[in-house]
Amino acid sequence: MQRRAVFGLFLLPLARGQGTCTPTPALAQGPYSLRDVPQREDLREGLPGVPLRLLLRVRDRACRPLQGARVDLWHTDALGRYSGVHAPGTFCRGWQATDERGEVAFLTLFPGWYPSRTPHLHLRVEVGGRVFATQLFFPEEVQREVYALPPYRERGMPRVNNRQDGLFRADLLLRLEREGEGYRGAFVLTLPF
């Protein structure tokens, strides 16, 4: 219930804007996906960084919410490192099952960057034995704000901006709003099946 209070008004215009139920573009899940990660909402594990609260709504092509879908989220920490790959642990990784509204919420950190990519989040949704993967991106004006703050500012701005990233798609850009010391965002994932 608290999730709806936090995101209800923010997500409502987004849901209306996707009334056609056009499938969300699929993107490669990437080389750093791990299956053995904790089921949890808070992915931060005490790491420094700008908080990011994310609500995802998963639905089918007929705009019906998908309950019980496994949603995995993973991304780099503030220094651009993936857990389980560049550093030990499971920070910035986790999964949840969607509720009766097709929703999951995560509390994580704004990701850092690494040289070949613009900042992004990885998502993998599994339902009924079928898998969908995509990535979400961040507005560059928000990147400028975040990367001017510690611990990000030591590394400066990403070397690759959204337009230079070959996987970037404007329709996968997160809408973000300020929330306390961080941001909140919401996204509707319409699966192609």
Regions found by a protein language model. Give the residues of each.
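Beta-strand-dominated extracellular/periplasmic modules and repeats
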Residues: 19-169, 182, 186-193
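Short, exposed beta-strand-loop hairpins at the edges of beta-sheets
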Residues: 176-178
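N-terminal secretory signal peptides and thylakoid transit peptides that target proteins
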Residues: 1-13
